[in-house]
Amino acid sequence: MNLILFGPPGAGKGTQAQFLVETYGIPQISTGDMLRAAVKAGTPLGVKAQEIMIQGGLVSDDIVLGIVAERLAQDDCAAGFVLDGFPRTIPQADALSVILKQVGRAIDHVISLEVDGEEIVNRLSGRRSCSSCGKGYHLVFDPPLRAGVCDVCGSGLVQRADDQEETVRNRLLVYEQQTAPLKDYYRSRQVLCSIPGIGSIVEIQQRIAAALVE
């Protein structure tokens, strides 16, 4: 089963990706992981990517797509894969389709976890962690016994810069601008599965599993 997984920050995408990996026995593949693996392995494309990244540049689509093609040709992808964070643009989606078509494959389903923006803001902006031991909390769902103080070591709690409300809203805006055209693209190809991302982890897993057998 060849899958793509979309989801805004804070939607629980990592948890659901792991569910797909364990349920269907297919690897989760992210662009970042692929680039790092290619660089570490010293492949020709990995060497090119490393040179660009060292100079602070953006790795071109040609290199990224080459690395994607190499990764999808590996033995562990024989039964399928879960692409996470790729494609990011319509040209990348078109190129991915060509890569797969060349080996007689296609994207079977695109899973899009749908969570209201305000819910995401509440989830992420409420997160706190201990400045000393790193234990995580949430002001609403998992608060400390004493406000602002770690239950374990008594140190102060801090909020990550990424979890500040303004930052979260900006990340959501970027996500929507980036994925809205892709969702339309895959909807027109009748492979988009929009999954409500509100509920327990198990409930969301059940929705995904049901969508994949339709």
From Swiss-Prot:
List keywords of the entry alphabetically: ATP-binding, Cytoplasm, Kinase, Metal-binding, Nucleotide biosynthesis, Nucleotide-binding, Transferase, Zinc
> Which GO BP annotation is one of this protein's?
AMP salvage
Q: Name one GO cellular component term.
A: cytoplasm
Where does the protein end up?
Answer: Cytoplasm
Its UniProt pathway annotation is:
Purine metabolism; AMP biosynthesis via salvage pathway; AMP from ADP: step 1/1
Quote the catalytic activity from the record: AMP + ATP = 2 ADP
Indicate which residues the UniProt annotation says bind AMP.
31, 36, 57-59, 85-88, 92, 160, 171
What molecular function does GO assign, one term? adenylate kinase activity
Q: Region labeled LID — which residues? A: 126-163
Fetch the InterPro entries from UniProt: Adenyl_kin_sub (IPR006259), Adenylat/UMP-CMP_kin (IPR000850), Adenylat_kinase_CS (IPR033690), Adenylate_kinase_lid-dom (IPR007862), P-loop_NTPase (IPR027417)
Residue span of region NMP: 30-59
Q: What is its EC number?
A: 2.7.4.3
Q: Is the keyword Acyltransferase in the record?
A: no
Q: Which residues bind Zn(2+)?
A: 130, 133, 150, 153
What is annotated about its quaternary structure and interactions?
Monomer.
Please give the record's comment on domains.
Answer: Consists of three domains, a large central CORE domain and two small peripheral domains, NMPbind and LID, which undergo movements during catalysis. The LID domain closes over the site of phosphoryl transfer upon ATP binding. Assembling and dissambling the active center during each catalytic cycle provides an effective means to prevent ATP hydrolysis. Some bacteria have evolved a zinc-coordinating structure that stabilizes the LID domain.
Described by its record, this protein's role is as follows: Catalyzes the reversible transfer of the terminal phosphate group between ATP and AMP. Plays an important role in cellular energy homeostasis and in adenine nucleotide metabolism.
Q: What is this protein called?
A: Adenylate kinase
Task: From the UniProt record, report the name of the gene that encodes this protein.
Answer: adk
